[in-house]
C-alpha cells in the first residue's frame, strides 16, 4: 500500500512538471500594463518630489498617484524591438487608466516596478 501511494505521488508530480522549453519572448511582470491601461514614460521626478517633499503631504506617499512630464509609449515599439521598458525610460514607467493624460502632472497612474 505504501509503495502504491509513493508511486502515485511521483506520477502526479511528473505530470504536473512543465515539459520542454518555453517559447516566445521573456517578459518581466513589471513590464506589463493591465487591460485598458496605457504605458507612459516619465522622465522628470522634480514635480513629484516638490509636491511630496517635507510637508503634511509627504506622509501620504503621493508619488504613487502623481507623475510628471510623461509621454505615452507605443506598444508596437516595445513589441517590435522586444526592448524591456526599463531601457526606454530614464526615470519611471507608469500605467495609466482610461482617463486622458495631457497635463504636466498626471493623476491616477501606477508605477511599473523596474527590476534591475
Curated annotation (Swiss-Prot):
Induction: Under normal conditions on SDAY medium (Sabouraud dextrose agar plus 1% yeast extract), hyd1B is increasingly up-regulated from 77-fold on day 3 to 161-fold on day 5, and maintained at high levels afterwards. Hyd1A is the most active at transcription level under normal culture conditions, followed by hyd1B, hyd1E, hyd2A and hyd2C in order. Disulfide bonds join 33-95, 41-89, 42-70, 96-109. Residues 1-16 form the signal peptide. It is found in: Secreted; Secreted, Cell wall; Spore coat; Vacuole. InterPro entries: Hydrophobin. It holds the Pfam family Hydrophobin. GO terms for molecular function: structural constituent of cell wall. Its main location: secreted. One of its GO terms (cellular component) is fungal-type cell wall. Keywords: Cell wall, Cytoplasmic vesicle, Disulfide bond, Secreted, Signal, Vacuole. It comes from the Eukaryota. Disruption phenotype: Causes a failure to assemble morphologically irregular rodlets into orderly bundles. Retains distorted surface bundles, but leads to truncated/incomplete rodlets within the bundles; and displays both decreased cell surface hydrophobicity and adhesion, but the mutant is unaffected in virulence. Does not affect radial growth and multiple stress responses. Not appreciably expressed in any of the single-cell types (aerial conidia, blastospores and submerged conidia), but constitutively expressed in growing mycelia and when cells are sporulating on chitin and insect cuticle. Aerial growth, conidiation, and dispersal of filamentous fungi in the environment rely upon a capability of their secreting small amphipathic proteins called hydrophobins (HPBs) with low sequence identity. Class I can self-assemble into an outermost layer of rodlet bundles on aerial cell surfaces, conferring cellular hydrophobicity that supports fungal growth, development and dispersal; whereas Class II form highly ordered films at water-air interfaces through intermolecular interactions but contribute nothing to the rodlet structure. Belongs to the fungal hydrophobin family. This is Class I hydrophobin B. It comes from Beauveria bassiana (strain ARSEF 2860).
